[in-house]
């Protein structure tokens, strides 16, 4: 039997939680291959937010071209869908230049959008929702649950008869599409599985994960202290002085920024700022690791191993070289 031809990945994805050493590994790869780095970090897109986001320095960015860093103002928003569009265009452009796209970051929703796509379910329809609400006011949610059971018994069976929000959404989807929500979700799950299979071939996904989470937690504390010493409060104060930003914006909700903002508002003291900032970073890290563990196509490297960069490089070399 003839072996299947070797196909190099379209791009390499270097994933990992906060403080796992992604930047150092990416720059080491840039010294071995002609890479261009595509940032996959929802905080690095913002201009004037350098310290609290641990943005690569100018010297680090000079080692290899970097993309999707400093592309929007903190007043603006940037979505996972926009990232997927931008990243796909960059991948094609970088490959056309004969270089290797290296996607680096820990914003796993962005990774999902790039490799699996986002939900195609219809959005909310105000008119249909108002119609359903009127029926519920007249007949009660148990009556609407009974209606749902007639058209989508699978969904109705897992919902309580007074679960207004979910009953409303299931009926809304049925009235919008003529199909039960259970069937729509099953189709989406099948599509996601297909996309995961495709992603395994199209992308080499390497995950930097800690064998000992306590060591990563110590790194997080050291890193946050370094940010405070490096001028995080001055950076946030400069953002406050603009006068058009507030803690409700996605940019200011970034870990570290919302805590520093609260401190400058006089809501918390310095000890609480540090405690909350470190705790929020650890929670972010936990969520990132949970996402990673639901990514079966990833190749895991212990980010605490002394030779973790060499392990990453070995995986990349094996994927790029024709057997």
Swiss-Prot record:
EC assignment: 2.5.1.75
Subunit organization: Monomer.
Enzyme class: transferase
Ranges in coiled-coil conformation: none
Region feature Interaction with substrate tRNA, mapped onto this chain: 41-44, 165-169, 253-258, 286-293
Catalytic activity reported: adenosine(37) in tRNA + dimethylallyl diphosphate = N(6)-dimethylallyladenosine(37) in tRNA + diphosphate
Statement: the UniProt record of this protein carries the keyword Nucleus: no
Free-text function comment from the UniProt entry: Catalyzes the transfer of a dimethylallyl group onto the adenine at position 37 in tRNAs that read codons beginning with uridine, leading to the formation of N6-(dimethylallyl)adenosine (i(6)A).
Cofactor(s) needed by this chain: Mg(2+)
GO biological process, one term: tRNA modification
Name this polypeptide is given: tRNA dimethylallyltransferase
Name of the gene encoding the protein in the UniProt record: miaA
Site (Interaction with substrate tRNA): 107, 129
UniProt: substrate binding residues: 18-23
Family classification: Belongs to the IPP transferase family.
A GO term for molecular function: ATP binding
Lineage: Bacteria, Pseudomonadati, Pseudomonadota, Betaproteobacteria, Burkholderiales
Originating species: Ralstonia nicotianae (strain ATCC BAA-1114 / GMI1000) (Ralstonia solanacearum)
One Pfam family linked to the record: IPPT
């Amino acid at each position: 039997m003839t072996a299947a031809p070797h196909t190099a990945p379209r791009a390499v994805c270097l994933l990992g939680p906060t403080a796992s050493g992604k930047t150092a590994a990416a720059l080491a790869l840039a010294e071995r291959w002609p890479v261009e780095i595509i940032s996959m970090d929802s905080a690095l897109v913002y201009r004037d937010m350098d310290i609290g986001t641990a943005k690569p320095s100018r010297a680090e960015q000079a080692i290899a071209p970097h993309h999707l860093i400093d592309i929007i103002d903190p007043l603006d928003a940037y979505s996972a869908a926009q990232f997927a569009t931008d990243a796909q265009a960059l991948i094609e452009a970088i490959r056309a230049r004969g270089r290797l796209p290296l996607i680096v970051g820990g914003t796993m929703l962005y990774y999902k959008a790039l490799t699996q796509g986002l939900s195609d379910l219809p959005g909310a329809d105000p008119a249909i929702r108002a119609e359903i609400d009127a029926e519920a006011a007249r007949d009660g949610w148990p009556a609407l649950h009974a209606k749902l059971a007639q058209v989508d018994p699978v969904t109705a069976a897992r919902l309580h008869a007074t679960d207004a929000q979910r009953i409303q959404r299931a009926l809304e989807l049925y009235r919008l599409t003529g199909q039960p929500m259970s069937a729509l979700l099953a189709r989406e799950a099948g599509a996601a599985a297909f996309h995961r299979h495709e992603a395994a071939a199209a992308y080499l996904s390497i995950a930097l994960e800690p064998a000992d989470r306590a060591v990563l937690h110590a790194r997080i504390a050291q890193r946050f202290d370094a940010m405070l010493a490096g001028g995080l409060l001055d950076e946030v104060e400069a953002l406050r002085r603009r006068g058009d930003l507030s803690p409700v914006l996605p940019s200011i909700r970034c870990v570290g920024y919302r805590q520093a903002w609260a401190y400058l508002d006089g809501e918390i003291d310095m000890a609480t700022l540090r405690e909350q900032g470190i705790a929020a970073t650890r929670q972010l890290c936990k969520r990132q690791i949970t996402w990673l563990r639901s990514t079966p196509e990833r190749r895991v490297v212990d980010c605490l191993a002394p030779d973790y960069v060499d392990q990453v490089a070995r995986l990349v070399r094996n994927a790029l070289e024709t057997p």
